[in-house]
Structure formats: structure tokens, C-alpha cells
Amino acid sequence: MIVNSKIVWYTFIISEDTNDTGLALIATPGAEELATLIDKRLITLFSESHLGKKLHKDTFILKSDCPRFTNGDAKGIIYETVRGKDLYIICDPGNHGVTYSFFGKEIPLTPDEHFENLKRIIAACNGKPQRITVVMPMLYGGRQHRRNARES
């Protein structure tokens, strides 16, 4: 790890046997566009490696899903292994463009439901990744103003 003027740069080692960095991305519903931009940048970064080894990988994004049942409940599924990886989960709780069917009606996801999807994906990892980092454009539940009365 290299620290330079408050920015932390991680040095990843490209494994010769598996041609892998141990880096993985998961996008929760509504954050796919941001995850794709990050993925494209990582692919160009590792394909232009100056370390003598180049990574030939199509994507860092792991296939995952948060399907919903008819009663509104959901579950988190990860279709690829996360064992030993540095996992970055990208979640956008401010995105109201994601909807789901609830008893025949299309309901937009609230920030609480986005946060629940994040917790479902973390629970689906079963503690197998080396490290889990959550990337959120908006810190959900991080109110920064003064309280006036007895409020949460």
C-alpha cells in the first residue's frame, strides 16, 4: 500500500497461474452504470500495466442479483466465488429509478430497500472475501445537521 497526499494507492499483484488480481466488483440494483465505469477504468489500468505483466480479463464485475418475491421480500445471490478477493460493493441508495413488482404494482426502491439489498449481498458473501469495501455516492443515514429535539 502506498500513501501519497491523503490518497491510498493499493498495489495489486497479478498472479501468473490464474491471471487474476484478486479484485472484484459487485453492483447492487441501481448502481450498474457506476460499476461499469469503474470496471472499464480498472480494465484499462491493468491492461496497460507497467510491471511487465498484463492482465487479460474481460470484467471485474461479478454476476449477482437481488430477486424479489411477490410479497416484497428479497434475497441476495452471488453467482461467482468471492473467496479470498478484495470485494468492492457499489450501492446507490439515492437512485429512485429501480422498481419492483409488489402485488401487481410497480414500486420504486426506497433508500432503506437499497440498504437492505447491500446487507443481503454482504450476507451472501458468508465472510469469504479477504476484504469488503462499500462504495456509496451518498452516505445513507449520515445526517450531518444539528438535532433540535428528541429525534433520531
Q: Predicted regions: what is each one?
A:
Residues M1-S152:
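PRPP-associated nucleotide enzymes
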